[in-house]
Design a protein with these regions (language model features):
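Long, basic/Gly/Ser/Thr-rich N-terminal segments
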Residues: 1-91
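Glycine-rich phosphate-binding loop of nucleotide-binding enzymes
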Residues: 102-189, 506
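Substrate-engagement module of ASCE P-loop NTPases
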Residues: 147-151, 439-445, 477-495
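Loop/turn-to-beta-strand initiation segments
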Residues: 158-162, 413-416, 452-456, 490-495
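P-loop NTPase motor domains
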Residues: 168-172, 203-479
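Conserved AAA+ ATPase "SRH/arginine-finger" region at the nucleotide-binding site
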Residues: 187-192, 202-206, 515-524
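Conserved ATP-driven motor cores of ASCE-family P-loop NTPases powering translocation/secretion/packaging/pilus
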Residues: 218, 475, 482-486, 490-544
Length: 544
């Protein structure tokens, strides 16, 4: 069938067709160029005179290796691939083995299944790419079903797979998993109207500076100190400690002293002091606070009066009152962080954080900081506040146990968790995925025994969440980039399912080792696929 080599150009080889027949059944079949090396090519076209193939790899030491290092010579023996070599391409046919994952049936080689080694596929970050309608969701569901439903020898009881489901379509695929011994499935939803005890919830007191920066859409690193101060204050104010009231007075006093020393005109100073005290006050410092002198008492408001010479004659009394309360050191107030607080509590802390940081004296600084407070207020009174409404305290370790076990049996671990994000907008879903992923990653990094609690985070419509965004500029890192670079050694693996790889974070995608590529059309996406590996050729791109 195969004659001499007529031409070799890049990865394409043209071979003389000795049969002088065109047989379409040979298209897609592999051939071997046998000499010192066993080069593998796939037949791409046939004419009466020539057969064209594309080199895709080599057989070395009983394994198939993608990529081309060598080229065939004129002395190469050319033949069709044999059965043993087909197995090296399509994978083991021992599907009952716990080491092998059934993927599907070969369209080229009748009677052969396609499989992958379980550990090789799921021990590295992976991506499943394909246009809308190409079968990505079906592919994911089928792969996971094959792990749990078609595996009778060794069930993966230690698996923890979290599916961030953009459309709520995976629930029916895994709802019967609990019928298998020692297996369990759990379902969370963002559907507030229908959820019972399975509504997506993140305790407000879990939110750290970077989480709040994302939630409040901070766009400048200078906004972070306000968030840090609010997180300090919320525990002090919520604790009901006697020092909490004292510290509130301290914050107000220091802010008012700054205004008094600003050098502004007395009328401006008076108006600003009254404005602050109207909104921020305590029983010790307010406009009606009595300032007593021998034989004469006045309210603080009266002490702010301006005489006919444009001066504030009683200002020294105001300074003495404020100085008496401006003595509290925040760092010396020790409060246990073992109680819950709400977004409403955090909002009150933001109020005092604004004046504590002195932003009232700068219009620009105030606008920048006040934006965060306004956004927090919008979340509290909007449709997203309910997802942070947890009124009881739990540690993050307790949260993880609660998240990954059945509510009726905390000894029963759930191997698949489906998170239905179909009822929230893309921006909020992106924030939730980042916060959850950070919680998972931090939990894994703090385990005494590294990688003892493996977690697979699978992101449907990953291009909505894993983007080249501004996280690095604002908070210093992107959680998905961090997980792709560091997560594997802690047992945290990311899986991206997307129709737009060109919109994914380049850092995250570059760390993926395994790819399943379905039908793709968009030129920018095809360029990304080709750049993923030197093993992807132009001919491979044409085939998808």
């Amino acid at each position: 069938m195969f004659g001499k080599i007529l031409d070799v150009h890049d990865y394409n080889v043209k071979i003389e067709n000795l049969t002088k027949r065109v047989e379409s059944s040979y298209l897609g079949v592999h051939i071997v160029f046998e000499e010192k090396f066993y080069l593998v090519g796939v037949i791409t076209s046939m004419t009466l005179d020539a057969i064209e193939c594309t080199l895709i790899g080599e057989f070395t030491n009983g394994k198939f290796n993608n990529g081309i290092i060598h080229k065939p010579s004129s002395s190469s023996l050319i033949r069709l691939i044999n059965k043993e070599e087909v197995l090296l391409l399509v994978g083991s046919q021992e599907l009952d083995s716990k080491d092998n994952l059934y993927i599907g049936k070969s369209l080229v080689y009748d009677g052969f299944n396609v499989s992958a080694r379980m550990n090789d596929l799921f021990s590295n970050h992976f991506a499943i790419l394909g246009n809308t309608g190409s079968g990505k969701s079906c592919c994911v569901a089928r792969l996971l079903q094959n792990i749990f439903y078609n595996n009778e020898t060794a069930m993966p009881t230690n698996a923890h797979i979290v599916l961030f489901d953009a459309f709520g379509e995976y629930n029916t695929a895994f709802e019967n998993l609990g019928q298998i011994p020692n297996m369990a499935f759990k379902y969370y939803t963002t559907d507030v109207k229908r959820a019972t005890n399975n509504l997506v919830k993140i305790p407000a007191y879990f939110l750290e500076v970077d989480d709040l920066a994302l939630l409040l859409n901070a766009n400048d690193p200078q906004q972070l100190p306000i968030i840090e101060k609010a997180l300090q204050l919320v525990y002090i104010f919520k604790s009901q400690d006697a020092k909490a009231l004292q510290y509130k007075s301290d914050i107000i006093a220091k802010s008012l002293l700054d205004i008094l020393s600003s050098g502004k005109q007395p009328t401006q100073v008076r108006d600003q002091l009254i404005a602050v005290l109207t909104n921020y006050n305590t029983p010790d410092i307010n406009l009606d606070t009595i300032i007593a002198q021998p034989g004469y008492s006045r309210t603080l408001r009266q002490c702010l009066n301006i005489d006919n010479q444009g001066k504030m004659p009683a200002v020294s009394l105001v300074v003495d009152l404020l100085s008496a309360h401006a003595k509290t050191d925040l760092d010396k107030i020790e409060v246990e962080h073992n109680f819950a607080y709400s977004l409403e509590d955090l909002y009150q802390a933001f109020e005092f954080a604004l004046i504590s940081e002195g932003v009232l004296s700068s219009e620009k600084a105030f606008d920048m900081a006040n934006t965060l407070k306004v956004r927090l207020h919008s979340i509290i009174n909007g449709e997203h506040g309910v997802y942070f409404d947890v009124d009881h305290f739990m540690t993050k370790e307790e949260f993880m146990i609660d998240f990954f076990t059945l509510p009726e049996n905390r000894q029963r671990t759930c191997q698949i968790i489906n998170m239905n994000f179909a009822y929230v907008d893309d921006r909020f879903a992106k924030i939730l995925t980042k916060i959850y992923s950070k919680i998972f990653f931090n939990f894994a990094t703090n385990l005494k025994r590294r990688a003892s609690f493996p977690i697979h985070i699978v992101l449907e419509e990953a291009h909505r969440y894993v983007q080249n965004d501004t996280d690095v500029e604002i908070i210093g890192y992107n959680i998905f980039d961090r997980i792709t670079k560091e997560g594997r050694k802690y047992g945290v693996i990311l899986g991206f399912i997307t129709q737009r790889p060109s919109e994914l974070s380049k850092t995250a995608l570059s760390q993926c080792s395994n790819f399943i590529v379905l039908r793709m059309y968009y030129p920018d996406d095809l360029i990304i696929i080709k750049s993923m590996s030197a093993k992807v050729t132009d001919e491979s791109i044409e085939r998808i």
